[in-house]
Regions:
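Exposed loop/turn and edge beta-strand positions of beta-sandwich/beta-sheet ligand-binding modules
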Residues: 7, 11, 76, 107, ...
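Hydrophobic ligand-binding cavity/cleft-lining segments
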Residues: 1-45
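A short small-residue
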Residues: 10, 124-131
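A conserved amphipathic terminal alpha-helix motif
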Residues: 84, 128-158
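Generic alpha-helical structural signal
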Residues: 18, 79, 145-149
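Hydrophobic-ligand binding "helix-grip"
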Residues: 35-36, 43, 49-50, 54, ...
Length: 158
């Protein structure tokens, strides 16, 4: 019988934006905006992006890994289920990641938008279970850090 392993990890990423919570929240809620910062990315080509932003709604992205990645030609799929949405305050979602046809993780993520004098503090908390040699918490935190860099660029757009 094949032995199955799981590694658990939690990380928190905090960012400050010179934008209102309404604008930062919109970058998560509007499919066109989210696709620009979330679904794009260096080293892969987006093949699928579907988003239904509502409690009970789902999101699915699939990108094909490029030749300079450790898994050239392999699909990386994100399947998301929206658990809780409070406009301009928080989004809670559960998501799984697949590499090819192998599920590599399942996570619960909470994004909080806190109004400040200078704009918005975003607090991203990820609680994950990483399966059999999956990417693990450190790599996932690095991936989300890169995604939030993309969010910074999206929020700088006019």
């Amino acid at each position: 019988m094949e032995e199955r392993s799981v590694t658990h990890g939690t990380f928190v990423i905090e960012r400050s934006y010179p934008n209102t919570p309404e604008r930062v929240f919109a970058a998560f809620a509007d499919p066109g905006k989210k696709r620009r910062w979330f679904a794009g990315g260096e080293g892969s080509e987006m093949e699928e992006f579907e988003m239904n932003f509502r409690v009970g709604g789902t999101e699915r992205t699939m990108r094909r890994m490029g030749p300079a990645t450790p898994f050239p030609g392999v699909a990386l799929t994100n399947e998301t289920y929206y658990e809780d949405i409070v406009p301009n305050r928080r989004v809670v979602f559960a998501y799984t990641m697949l590499l090819g046809d192998r599920r590599i993780s399942a996570s619960l993520a909470t994004v909080e938008f806190v109004r400040t004098e200078k704009g918005t503090d975003l607090i991203f908390t990820d609680q994950g279970a990483y399966f059999e040699s999956g990417d693990g918490p450190k790599m996932r935190e690095g991936g989300w850090s890169k995604l939030l860099e993309g969010l910074t660029k999206e929020l700088a757009r006019p």
